[in-house]
C-alpha cells in the first residue's frame, strides 16, 4: 500500500513559505544553496519535512518493545544526522552485512542509503532477514527509490537531498515525530523555535546563562532542553563532567545524570496514579488500610492525599549513613566489607558493601519515626519510600524492573533507569560528588542519595538516572494527557487531578506527588507541574504554554555543599527566557 505524506506542523500555517506558490522541492533545493540561520532554518526544516516521501504500512514504528532495532549502512556513505536522530527515539544496534544473521523475525532493520546506485550494488545477492525492514533513501526521487528498493521492502522514506535537514526529517517520519493531514505525531519531533511559536534570537539568550552557570562554579556541566508544541527546539549543553579535576571530559548530549528527587515523579508516581485509576487505592484511603505493615503505628491513619502533598506529618529524612561511620567519617567495620558475601550484600560504591540487615533497619526506623499532626507542609522523602513499597506490593515486581518494562522501554527512554552501570560505561555518566564524608570516593554511576545507596540504588524517592532526551519523552507523555508513541499510559483526567493544587484552599501549593509553582512564583504558568532534584536537576511541564523544560546538571560535584546554582537562580532565569521567547501568545 502506497503512503505519501506531505508533512507539516500546524504552526507552519502562521509562517508563510515561498514554496506555497511554487514547487516545495525546488524551494528546498534553492534554500540549501544559501547560508541558513535563525528563522530561515525553521523554514528550511519545514520544507525538508514537506518534501519527504513516505511509503509503507510499518511507518511510523509504534511498538519499540517487540524486538531489537538494528541499523545498517547499505554502502560506505555515512548519514551522520540520520544516525544521530534515530538514536534519540530508541536504542539502536549497529549491524554490518556480515552480522545480519543476528536478526530475528521480531526485530526491525533500518537501512540507510546515501547513494542509491552504490547501495543497490552493495545489497545485491545478500540474504536479508525476515523482519520489518525500513529503508531511508537520500539523494533519490521517490519513484527511483521505490523502483530500486521496492523488492527489499514496502517501507521506504526518501528525499531528493542528503542535507542534514532531510536526514532529521526522515528519522522523525520513521518514529512518528511528524504529523500529516491524516494523523498527528505520536512522538517528539525536532526542529527550530519558529516552528513552535518561539523566537530563535530570544531563546539563544539561554546560551549565555549556560556559560555563566558553569563559569560561576554552580556546576561543572549543564544540559538544557526545551520542547514546545511537540517539538524539541532547544537542546544544548555546556561544560565538563568534573571541572578541572583530572579525568574530566566535555559533557555531550547523551550524558546520563543522577536525577535525585525527580525520581519521585518520573519513576514512582506513575504507578501510584495507575493504582488510583485501577481503583486499587483512593486518595482518602488511610495508609494502614492500604498497607497492613502500618497498622498499629503512628502512621496508620495518614491519608494518601496528605502523604502525596507532604502534609501528613512525616519526618523529612533520616541520615542513616551517620549511624555507620566513626567520628572521623570512616566506615565502621561491623557495617561494611570491601567484597560482598551472604551478609554484606548492599553495594553502595565500588569496593564498599553494607550489611544486608541495614535494609530492615532503614524500614523500621522509618516506620517508628515521630510524626506531627498539624497538617503543615514538610517535604519528606519518606513519602516515596512508602509509595515505592506500595507499588511493589500491588504489582508484585521490584520498582526498577517495573519502570523498565512498563515505562521506559515502551516509551523509548532507553538510557533511563536505576543502576546505570549495569548497562552503560562510566564515561557516559556524569559524577555526582567527590565525596569525602562517607564513601570517600568520586560517586559516579552510583546513586548520590545516601538512603537509596543502602537500598542497592533503588528507591521511590531517588535512584533514577536519565538523559535530557528521555526526560523530555516522559514529560511529553504527561503533556499529552498520558499517551506517547501510540500507547496510553495514564488517563488525562488522572494527570489533571494529580498535577492540580489539591490543597490550595489550605495554603499548600503542592500537587499530588508533583511539585508546582509556589504562590509567589511569577515565572511559570499556574498549571505548571514537575519536580526538582538535589543534584541540580529540574523537569517542568506547562500545559497552558504546551511546553517542556528540562534542566540537568551535577551541581553537587565536587561538593554537595555548593549552593551557587540556587543562589544564582540559574534554573529560574533559563525558564524565564523560555517564556520570553514565546511569540504566539500562549504564555499562560
Task: Please tell me what each predicted stretch does.
Residues 23-26, 59-61, 146-147, 180-186, ...:
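Short, gly/Ser/Thr-rich active-site loops of penicillin-recognizing serine hydrolases
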Residues 198-259, 280-282, 449, 560:
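Short, conserved catalytic-motif segment at the N-terminal edge
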Residues 216-225, 245-309, 369-383, 459-462:
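Short active-site loop at a secondary-structure junction
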Residues 299-527:
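Short, surface-exposed loop or secondary-structure junction motifs
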Residues 535-548:
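Short, surface-exposed beta-strand/loop micro-motifs that present aromatic residues
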Amino acid at each position: 500500500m502506497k503512503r505519501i505524506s506531505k508533512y507539516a506542523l500546524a504552526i507552519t500555517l502562521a509562517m508563510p513559505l515561498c514554496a506555497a506558490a511554487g514547487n516545495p522541492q525546488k524551494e528546498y533545493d534553492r534554500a540549501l544553496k544559501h547560508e541558513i540561520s535563525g528563522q530561515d532554518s525553521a523554514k528550511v526544516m519545514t520544507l525538508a519535512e514537506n518534501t519527504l516521501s513516505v511509503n509503507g504500512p510499518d511507518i511510523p514504528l509504534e511498538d519499540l518493545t517487540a524486538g531489537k532495532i538494528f541499523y545498517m549502512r547499505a554502502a560506505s556513505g555515512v548519514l551522520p544526522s540520520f544516525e544521530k536522530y534515530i538514536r534519540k527515539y530508541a536504542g539502536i544496534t549497529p549491524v554490518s552485512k556480515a552480522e545480519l544473521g543476528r536478526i530475528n523475525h521480531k526485530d526491525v532493520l533500518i537501512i540507510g542509503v546515501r547513494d542509491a546506485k552504490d547501495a543497490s550494488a552493495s545489497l545485491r545477492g545478500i540474504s536479508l532477514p525476515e523482519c520489518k525492514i525500513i529503508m531511508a533513501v537520500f539523494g533519490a526521487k521517490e519513484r527511483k527509490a521505490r523502483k530500486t528498493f521496492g523488492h527489499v521492502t514496502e517501507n521506504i522514506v526518501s528525499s531528493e537531498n542528503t542535507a542534514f535537514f532531510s536526514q532529521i526529517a526522515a528519522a522523525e517520519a520513521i518514529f512518528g515525530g511528524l504529523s500529516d493531514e491524516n494523523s498527528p505525531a505520536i512522538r517528539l519531533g525536532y526542529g527550530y523555535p519558529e516552528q513552535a511559536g518561539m523566537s530563535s534570537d530570544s531563546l539563544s539568550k539561554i546560551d549565555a546563562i549556560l556559560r555563566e552557570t558553569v563559569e560561576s562554579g554552580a556546576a561543572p556541566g549543564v544540559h538544557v532542553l526545551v520542547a514546545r508544541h511537540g517539538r524539541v527546539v532547544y537542546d544544548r549543553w555546556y561544560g565538563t563532567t568534573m571541572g578541572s579535576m583530572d579525568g574530566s571530559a566535555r559533557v555531550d548530549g547523551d550524558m546520563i545524570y543522577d536525577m535525585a528527587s525527580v525520581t519521585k515523579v518520573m519513576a514512582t508516581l506513575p504507578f501510584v496514579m495507575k493504582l488510583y485509576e485501577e481503583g486499587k487505592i483512593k486518595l482518602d484511603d488511610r495508609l494502614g488500610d492500604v498497607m497492613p505493615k502500618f497498622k498499629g503505628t503512628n502512621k496508620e491513619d495518614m491519608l494518601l492525599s496528605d502523604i502525596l502533598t507532604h502534609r501528613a506529618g512525616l519526618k523529612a529524612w533520616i541520615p542513616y549513613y551517620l549511624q555507620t561511620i566513626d567520628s572521623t567519617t570512616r566506615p565502621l567495620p561491623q557495617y561494611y566489607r570491601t567484597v560482598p558475601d551472604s551478609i554484606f550484600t548492599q553495594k553502595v560504591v565500588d569496593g564498599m558493601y553494607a550489611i544486608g540487615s541495614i535494609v530492615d533497619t532503614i524500614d523500621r526506623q522509618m516506620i517508628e519515626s515521630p510524626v506531627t499532626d498539624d497538617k503543615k507542609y514538610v517535604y519528606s522523602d519518606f513519602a516515596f519510600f512508602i509509595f515505592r513499597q506500595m507499588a511493589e506490593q500491588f504489582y508484585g515486581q521490584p520498582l526498577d524492573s517495573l519502570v523498565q518494562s512498563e515505562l521506559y522501554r515502551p516509551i523509548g527512554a532507553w538510557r533511563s533507569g536505576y543502576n546505570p552501570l549495569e548497562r552503560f560505561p562510566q564515561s557516559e555518566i556524569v559524577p555526582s560528588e567527590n565525596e569525602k564524608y562517607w564513601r570517600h570516593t568520586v560517586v559516579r554511576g552510583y546513586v548520590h542519595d545516601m538512603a537509596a545507596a543502602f537500598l542497592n540504588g533503588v528507591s521511590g524517592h531517588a535512584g533514577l538516572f536519565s538523559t535530557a532526551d528521555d526526560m523530555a519523552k516522559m514529560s511529553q507523555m504527561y503533556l499529552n494527557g498520558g499517551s506517547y508513541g501510540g500507547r496510553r499510559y495514564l488517563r488525562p483526567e488522572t494527570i489533571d487531578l494529580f498535577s492540580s493544587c489539591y490543597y490550595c484552599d489550605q495554603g499548600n501549593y503542592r500537587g499530588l506527588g508533583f511539585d508546582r509553582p509556589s504562590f509567589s512564583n511569577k515565572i511559570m504558568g499556574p498549571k505548571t507541574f514537575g519536580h526538582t532534584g538535589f543534584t541540580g536537576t529540574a523537569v517542568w511541564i506547562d500545559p497552558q504554554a504546551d511546553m517542556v523544560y528540562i534542566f540537568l546538571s551535577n551541581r553537587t560535584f565536587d561538593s554537595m555543599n555548593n549552593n551557587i546554582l540556587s543562589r544564582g537562580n540559574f534554573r529560574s532565569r533559563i525558564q524565564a527566557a523560555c517564556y520570553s521567547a514565546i511569540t504566539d501568545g500562549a504564555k499562560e
